[in-house]
């Protein structure tokens, strides 16, 4: 896996998140795997180095509980460091300018109907993906959702540090990124608008305004 996302701080310094999508302890299988699950720093000359081991934090702390799994997915610069979403950890992390990790939020596991129409419910991970700082200074995080990837089952959460995640918008499918325009409208990017299980690769970009949602 390569970089999932990049961010620049006010000094123009770049960081990138490198995914993993596995138990962090599996990285001992080879030297090359040690570079996965990292927040890396890069210079203007193109040189890079591992900076913060996000996956190791999951191995050490497992903030959301459950089986060990780390997949650093998105990063956003903030005044005192960076905000990182980890899709495997089901958590949003703060990384200070000195590289110290702390938990901003964890996301709740839910249930979803599977097979569709059966009435049977199965556990579903939230799988937080894209994160952005909103115009109000809060953090906004989209969900891919885990299996069975139900159509309309993904949320966008609003997070203020020190408070539980607040549901901001719902009814999306397999979200991989979020963004705001200069007017404060939220854009939500779906990788598979009819569900990853549908076999249809069509995605969608959706603009959410005060008057509703509109596909772009």
What positions do the PLM features span?
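Short, conserved, GDST-rich strand-edge loop motifs in beta-rich repeat architectures
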Residues: 16-37, 140-153, 188-203
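Beta-propeller fold detector
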Residues: 1, 48-56, 102-109, 113-114, ...
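C-terminal closing repeat unit and adjoining cap/tail of repeat-based domains
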Residues: 194, 202-216
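A gly/proline- and charged-residue-enriched helix-loop-helix capping module
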Residues: 9-12, 17-64
